[in-house]
A protein has these predicted regions:
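A structural signal for beta-rich interaction modules in eukaryotic proteins
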Residues: 1-111, 115-295
Length: 295
């Protein structure tokens, strides 16, 4: 399939995969999709796009990078590493989501895809790089992930471009003795799936909010929340993090009597890059606390 053919194709059909895990509390999940036949299909959970040649079952999961394997080739992770299982020749193209904002010509020299098998690692040249995905031709599967060329990235580091980011909110159960509650902010690149992060914060309640923002790597950010007792840490550097743990970037300590808080993420120039009024109450009458609803 040529690059021109790819551009002329209709948008992919979206599907919601079946989530599988060894136990309800397991942080490791797999995604399963019964593909109905040939076509282009996009996973609503991971952003992956599969160009299918036939009806088949797809099973895939995010696995941990081994950066010591990448370093000799001068590569660093630029997305999650996905282990994909399906019959040979069932998939003809794979589209992996990226978070870059740089122009397409620059991305051609910056991004590539690694294919890791039991026999070793190979570097795949992209067929095309769009505003959202890196596209490669595939025939058989094991593990695939987007990488950056270390030398190219740092050659242009003096004139950095932001990446597409996201801010995820997780509310911890309240401490009834101290009448305090902690709200965690997890600041990540756009191409980290929400479900991967939620599985690492299963004792917290995820609070939906507008996610998108633009972030600069290796620059520090602060959080402003006027109603907070304390925000920890006072500042934090933003780096690309592709798991597996997804620890909180910031912790905001609040009174349990607080129902709504305004939170702003600010850059080094004290400019808001993300801001939201966060509702800490559930949908029931009188705004009962979300933990009392078991949400």
């Amino acid at each position: 399939m040529s690059e021109d053919d790819t551009k002329l194709m209709a948008p992919p059909s979206s599907f919601t995969p079946e989530l599988q895990s060894e136990s309800p509390k397991s942080a490791q999940i797999s995604y399963r999709f019964m593909c109905p036949g040939p076509g282009r299909f996009q996973c609503s959970s991971t952003g992956l796009v599969f160009v299918m040649a036939q009806k088949t079952e797809l099973v895939y999961k995010a696995i941990q990078w081994n950066e010591s394997v990448l370093q000799p080739s001068g590569k660093i992770p630029a997305g999650l590493l996905f282990k994909i299982q399906c019959p040979e020749d069932a998939v003809c193209q794979l589209h992996l989501p990226h978070c870059e904002t740089k122009d397409a010509e620059f991305l051609k020299s910056l991004l590539s895809v690694v294919h890791i098998t039991d026999d070793g690692m190979s570097i795949l040249k992209p067929l095309e790089i769009t505003d959202t995905h890196v596209i490669v031709t595939v025939s058989h599967f094991s593990a695939f992930g987007i990488v950056r060329a270390f030398e190219v990235f740092y050659r242009f580091f003096s004139n950095p471009c932001p990446v597409h980011g996201q801010v995820l909110l997780f509310l911890r159960p309240p401490n009834l003795n101290s009448q305090r509650q902690n709200l965690h902010l997890v600041v990540l690149s756009r191409n980290v799936p929400l479900e991967e992060v939620r599985r690492r914060h299963q004792d917290s309640v995820y609070i939906p909010a507008p996610l998108k923002c633009l972030l600069f790597e290796d620059q520090h950010y602060t959080v402003d929340c006027p109603t907070a007792f304390i925000v920890q840490p006072k500042k934090a550097d933003f780096d690309l993090d592709f798991g597996p743990n997804y620890h909180p970037t910031f912790e905001i300590r609040l009174s349990t009597s607080i129902k709504v808080v305004t939170i702003a993420l600010r850059d080094q120039k004290n400019t808001d890059v993300w801001k939201h009024d966060v509702d800490l109450t559930g949908p029931g009458p009188e705004g009962n606390h979300i933990f009392r609803h078991g949400l």
